[in-house]
Amino acid sequence: MDSLLELNRVNTAREIIRKKIQNTGRNSIYDLTGLCGGFEICEENLKLIETYVGPAIFSEKLNNAGLSHLSGNSKIHNAVCFNRTSSAILSTIMTLSKSFEKLVHYVPEKPAHPSIPRSCKIFGMEYFESDSLEEILSKIDENSFTAITGATMDHKVVSEEIACKIIDYAKSKNSPVFFDDASGARLRKLYKESPALEMGADLVVTSMDKLMDGPRAGLLAGDKNLVDKIYSEGLKFGLEAQAPIMAAVVTALERFDLNNLKDAFERAEKVDLSVFEAEKIEYKKTPTGFIIKNSSEEKLIETALKLLENYGIVTITAAGMPGASKNIRIDFCSKDAERISDEYVINAVLNSLK
């Protein structure tokens, strides 16, 4: 979809949200995106969110909490923070494009998040994407940089068996492995899959507001030498997280509780969506909710805006960034999901599709 049309969609959604909050308050909005968001900073840290003092304090705390969250080893790994996961990806590809000619990207289900192919295009890096293991293995060589998506935008999770095969093969070809685990770092824990760094990935990035209560920031961890190079490049272009974001990320990491995700997982398993089948609506359950599909992006956007206007339900389809999947994803891990019943959500979807 054209980027200006995407911007118009975002602005329309923001205007609806703004008016609803002005007229009836925040409780009239139900953010079910799964990008929970949060910017909690304790009183002690609030006094330290200064340009140079803040990073001096929070970088160490963030490294420790980040490595713990991503199961890193402090002897060989570092963790740093960028202002967006897309910023971390951009900085990673900017750095690795100096040593490798192409990026070979495995996704459990196409398409990949647009930030990866777009970054490759900026730096003239050849890009190949596939959800076929055989195709991916045939493309990996000493001139390639390998990427794996841990969970797609619609929350399809990579199998650990496939991930390990790709990592092992890439290692044999001296191709570094980057794990895009934006939501997967937490989602895959529900399936008791191994963390990316434990599987042997050289780098992993995860988003601090996806399936957790942190700010919209990217946490990058992995091989110390690679992380230092990537962070150094990011600093040149202002891609790094500033003190307030770092402080909020530290809080989110220290307070993360997988049980909240497990509750959403159980709710998603139990929710009765048989009415969608009766109405011949294409849908699919996800680990923490469900998605509504349609061959027409325009129809999905129209439906999502109706959901927002008439029922106060915020979805990525309506309010998400340009390039995001247009399937309507309802995510029960969002904080607002606690205030809303399954029946309300299902009826809202049914009525909005009419």
UniProtKB/Swiss-Prot annotation:
InterPro entries: PyrdxlP-dep_transferase_arc, PyrdxlP-dep_Trfase, PyrdxlP-dep_Trfase_major, SelA-like, UPF0425_MJ0158-like_C
Requisite cofactors: pyridoxal 5'-phosphate
Any Pfam family hit: UPF0425_C
SUPFAM superfamilies named among the record's database cross-references: PLP-dependent transferases (SSF53383)
Keyword annotations of the record: Pyridoxal phosphate
This protein's record includes keyword NAD: no
Keyword RNA-binding: no
Residue numbers of N6-(pyridoxal phosphate)lysine PTMs: K210
Entry GO MF terms: L-seryl-tRNA(Sec) selenium transferase activity
Gene3D superfamilies according to UniProt: 3.90.1150.70, Type I PLP-dependent aspartate aminotransferase-like (Major domain) (3.40.640.10)
Protein family membership: Belongs to the UPF0425 family.
Protein's recorded name: UPF0425 pyridoxal phosphate-dependent protein MMP0002
Species per Swiss-Prot/TrEMBL record: Methanococcus maripaludis (strain DSM 14266 / JCM 13030 / NBRC 101832 / S2 / LL)
